[in-house]
Amino acid sequence: MFAKGKGSAVPSDGQAREKLALYVYEYLLHVGAQKSAQTFLSEIRWEKNITLGEPPGFLHSWWCVFWDLYCAAPERRDTCEHSSEAKAFHDYSAAAAPSPVLGNIPPNDGMPGGPIPPGFFQGPPGSQPSPHAQPPPHNPNSMMGPHSQPPGAVPGTQPLLPNSMDPTRQQGHPNMGGPMQRMNPPRGMGPMGPGPQNYGSGMRPPPNSLGPGMPGINMGPGAGRPWPNPSSANSIPYSSSSPGTYVGPPGGGGPPGTPIMPSPADSTNSSDNIYTMINPVPPAGSRSNFPMGPGSDGPMGGMGGMEPHHMNGSLGSGDIDGLPKNSPNNISGISNPPGTPRDDGELGGNFLHSFQNDNYSPSMTMSV
């Protein structure tokens, strides 16, 4: 409260009494009580020189300020006269005082620090992400919306989410976004768990998200006219204008889920970048059953157990039914003979999103 420099001593009670006596004497002189002032000095035995200040004196001024504030207190302002300045002083002091409930809590302490726990902003069960890490989408313009893109549109404008994730489309099967309610697992496959991972445009699934023998998939926006079909009889026509959408051969020497063909994005104009499924999966004797749920092999771990199929242009099984038709993000052209791809479908960012179920029969299988 007081400075403790080398040339200044700490004020003591004696100094405070001297100051008060000086101010009393000064007050008596300013109010005209000169005899009382001299008597006061003689009675206290004052021996020092006194220097008077300007009237009305410090004691009088100090008292007036104190009294004004005292009368302006909330409990006395209605009965005592006071100035507006004194009232404003009390009101401002009450507003600036900390709340007795909160105390002196610093700002930004209303929320606990640290990262947000998992599931804090958890959505419905059908929209839960895969436990596997995935890269961020490469196309910031891909937003959720109606899948009404015409053929020949600019790649990169295909919405990232399938029909099951689109709130504007409620018809058909909830497909890959949630549990497979109407899709029986094909032969050689275990029960389907909560939805396999959906990969958006330009995104690759992690290697451990595909089961053994599953071809590597590099999904692209896939909205345009079909690519020409090669003369090889081992292929299935796909419709896509996106370099970067292809299905490589399964089990081609690399780890499961590793794309075998080089990314068509590196040579977009090459005639070699025909997106085909080159070879079937291994024979039934070497297959293993993998449950199609979020297990150790990822959400699509059971795809390696699919039956070989005939190359008559139909990719399907007798155990699959009830899937929506003519939906974007579908594999199209699979119900046509090789070399005659269709123009009315699109290959989107979701493998096995839904099948064209107009020209298949339970007896159709695909093999080489």
Swiss-Prot record:
GO terms for molecular function: single-stranded DNA binding. Residues 174-189, 211-220, 230-248, 326-337 have a biased composition (Low complexity). InterPro entries: LisH, SSDP_DNA-bd. Expressed in embryonic fibroblasts and chondrocytes. Residues 16-48 form the LisH domain. Signal peptide: none annotated. May be involved in transcription regulation of the alpha 2(I) collagen gene where it binds to the single-stranded polypyrimidine sequences in the promoter region. This is Single-stranded DNA-binding protein 3. It comes from Gallus gallus.
